[in-house]
């Protein structure tokens, strides 16, 4: 959705309705990162949740020539495909955490793994504060057992972490998918976190199209 917003809003400020209330910080981060990557979105409002937008009228009533857009499931599938640049099921690595993975996202990853192990490199980019909490909760042990490599205070797009001279990288980050090919030499494939996990277990690209209907 963030990638779609960036392509359609450009430099404009958007007011968004229809999100769950409250929207999680992780969803806000993903939305903002995707919109800023594919467009130049520096500000958006979520009506009823962000401070300046208690109602739609509060921010739109006196603004002329507003435009209303309603993305469909087909729009989001097309955006997913726009962020995916591989025509085969071959896969070399998984990379998540742009913006950096939070503690709740890491717990969701462990839940999705269900004690299974990735057979390809699986990078999780996060920060030192999340790492400290994972260490305290003794969660690095199951992560390492699952083949997860923790990348701290940087990301695979700007640090020489990825192995080889290219390949296919799957991610649940619109930001990674957008910038990754130009910055890493890896072809990107976009999917959900569960898609990334199932693909990591099999070593082949797997996507659940039911999520996009």
Model-predicted regions and their roles:
Residues 1-123, 196-213:
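Intrinsically disordered, low-complexity segments enriched in small residues
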Residues 21-22, 49-52, 100-101, 128-130, ...:
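Short, glycine-/Ser/Thr-/acidic-enriched flexible segments
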Residues 91, 147, 165-167:
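Short, well-ordered alpha-helix to beta-strand connector turns
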Residues 101-102, 116-163:
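Extended C-terminal subregions enriched in glycine
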Residues 107-108, 136-137, 182:
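Short amphipathic alpha-helical segments
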Residues 156-158, 164-213:
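Peripheral docking tails and interdomain loops at the edges
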């Amino acid at each position: 959705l963030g990638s779609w917003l960036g392509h359609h809003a450009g430099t404009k400020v958007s007011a968004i309705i229809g999100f769950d209330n409250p929207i999680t910080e992780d969803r806000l981060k993903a939305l903002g990162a995707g919109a800023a990557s594919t467009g130049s979105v520096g500000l958006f409002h979520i009506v009823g949740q962000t401070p300046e937008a208690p109602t739609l009228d509060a921010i739109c009533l006196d603004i002329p020539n507003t435009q209303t857009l309603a993305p469909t499931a087909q729009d989001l599938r097309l955006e997913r495909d726009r962020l995916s640049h591989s025509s085969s099921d071959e896969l070399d690595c998984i990379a998540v955490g742009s913006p950096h993975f939070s503690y709740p996202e890491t717990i969701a990853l462990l839940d999705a793994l269900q004690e299974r192990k990735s057979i390809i490199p699986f990078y999780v980019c996060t920060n030192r504060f999340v790492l400290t909490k994972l260490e305290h909760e003794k969660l690095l042990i199951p992560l390492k057992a699952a083949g997860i490599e923790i990348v701290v205070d940087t990301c695979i797009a700007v640090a020489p972490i990825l192995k080889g001279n290219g390949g296919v990288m799957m991610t649940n980050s619109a930001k990674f998918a957008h910038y990754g090919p130009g910055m890493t030499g890896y072809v990107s494939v976009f999917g959900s976190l569960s898609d990334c996990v199932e693909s990591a277990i099999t070593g082949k690209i797997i996507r659940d199209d039911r999520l996009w209907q």
